[in-house]
Design a protein with these regions (language model features):
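Short hydrophobic/aromatic beta-strand or adjacent loop that forms the aromatic wall/cage
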Residues: 36-38, 154-161
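Conserved beta-strand-loop-alpha-helix junction that forms the acyl-donor binding cleft
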Residues: 112, 117-128, 144-156
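Short aromatic/hydrophobic contact patches that present stacked aromatics
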Residues: 81, 117-119, 160
Length: 164
């Protein structure tokens, strides 16, 4: 992750129901963009390459908490996390699916024997549908307190999915 991409990603703002994915105001999360486990994704737009998303791999893609710790002890799977630029979400152009396929291809090239696992907030049905289209299946669920609007924590249900 280079500094310019990290700065751009840190400024992305999602609609309120997806705001848990904003980096803004969470300096620790912003620093994590430089931990070597986050990769910017560029796509050619109007003749030049533009930042369209990012992929996180391994521990950077896990939603760790008391109720999920056991799930991530299974080291036969490599975790992926995905972030699509907010203005590109929900447009029906298949960008989310392309990002998932890119992440899976990367993990499979680096760790061919590993399963591929991801974790998504259950209420984000649009993302769950994309992952299902990419051949992921739900395997487990857990709850974790997450930052909400105005910094108030709220319970959130997460779904763990494995690539078939």
């Amino acid at each position: 992750m280079n500094e310019a991409a990290a700065r751009d990603i840190a400024e992305w703002r999602y609609p309120e129901e997806y705001s848990m994915y904003d980096f803004s105001g969470y300096e620790e999360e912003e620093k994590q963009l430089f931990n070597g486990l986050h990769f910017p994704v560029y796509e050619k737009e109007i003749g030049e390459f533009a930042l369209v998303g990012f992929v996180s791999v391994g521990p950077a893609a896990q939603v760790v908490g008391r109720s999920s710790r056991k799930i991530y002890e299974d080291e036969s799977a490599t975790d992926i996390g995905l972030g699509l630029r907010p203005d590109l979400c929900g447009q029906g152009k298949g960008l989310g699916l392309r990002l998932v396929e890119l992440a899976v291809a990367f993990v499979k090239s680096e760790f061919p024997d590993d399963n591929v696992r991801l974790t998504v907030a259950a209420q984000h049905k649009r993302a769950v549908k994309v992952y299902e289209r990419a051949a992921f299946v739900k395997t487990e669920e857990f709850r974790k307190m997450m930052p909400g609007v105005n910094g108030k924590k709220r319970p959130c249900r997460f779904v763990v999915m494995i690539l078939k």
